Amino acid sequence: MGVDLGGLVEPREIELKELNNRTVAVDAYNTLYQFLSIIRQQDGAPLADDRGNVTSHLSGIIYRVTNLVEEGMKPVFVFDGKPPSFKAETIKARAEVREAARQMYEAAKAAGSAEAYKYAQASTSINRQIVDDAKVLLGYMGIPFIVAPSEGEAQAAYMVSRGAADYVGSQDYDSLLFGAPRVVRNIAITGKRKVPRKNIYMDVKPEVIELQEVLATLGLTREELIDMAILVGTDYNPGIFKVGPKTALKLVKKHGDNMPAILDELGQTIENWEAIKEFFLHPTVTDDYQVKWGKPEPAKIKEFLCEEHSFSVDRVDKVLERLTTAVSETTKQKTLSSWF
């Protein structure tokens, strides 16, 4: 879910074409959740193949990632590894929320309620099969992926800070806490999107957030930004009741990088806050990775999607033509640029 900084951070809208020839380290789990939540049937059920296996994420990867490649973007997907021990309670709580949402979805669906779609989205979860299938399809498409030693966003942030990528691609703001210099949002959902439960549509454009701009605007150090996030709530702690971003900002402005003083004023405690802060500042990351794009393998993609997962042959043929053309054009441009 990520930390809630939306009310304090002002992203800068860009056009997708501005990411041409830019490497984006995509938070894989975050993006898969988007695909699984958004790409659904009218009753809220995810897309599935003839055997009942969920395929919404595969649809998102083949069609929407192809859109990004056509714009000249160079995505590299970064998957989560082993989460830190203090994330266990969050993982457990989320599983309980999703199970409750699943039960409400089934009840709403049986009753023919319009609320079914909302509950279906809230029940979205990722299992090992979904992750494995995503990696297979990305590999066949020639899109590189990395498995982080711990949190994918931390690894992606590290890659951008080291110059191996230009942006972290994620809907969450956590990448900023991990030190990502630049984050781009909405790359996977750009275009017209229906407003939930309303018969209206809105334009969704990519948004860029730069860490130094955020710190300068808020008048904080990165350490203080992390303290503020911990007060509001992160992936590793629930935050303090009734302390939102604005209240947290005031407290950090008053006390600076002094969490004990803030907690003393509030009369509250936050379990593991020191370990959480240390993890944001010094997460487990690795230099043992390669970022290399390959050529798509149309025959393997077609077999995987059409024969194994019941995709339409005609639709897959069309998107494969687009993908191979886009990769070919990118290769030509790279070859030409080497002459100058």
From Swiss-Prot:
Interacts with PCNA. PCNA stimulates the nuclease activity without altering cleavage specificity. The lineage of its organism: Archaea, Methanobacteriati, Methanobacteriota, Stenosarchaea group, Methanomicrobia. Mg(2+) 2 binds at residues 172, 174, 235. One of its GO terms (molecular function) is 5'-3' exonuclease activity. Binds 2 magnesium ions per subunit. They probably participate in the reaction catalyzed by the enzyme. May bind an additional third magnesium ion after substrate binding. Its EC number is 3.1.-.-. GO terms for biological process: DNA repair; DNA replication, removal of RNA primer. This is Flap endonuclease 1. It comes from Methanocella arvoryzae (strain DSM 22066 / NBRC 105507 / MRE50). Belongs to the XPG/RAD2 endonuclease family. FEN1 subfamily. SUPFAM superfamilies: 5' to 3' exonuclease, C-terminal subdomain, PIN domain-like. Keywords: DNA damage, DNA repair, DNA replication, Endonuclease, Exonuclease, Hydrolase, Magnesium, Metal-binding, Nuclease.
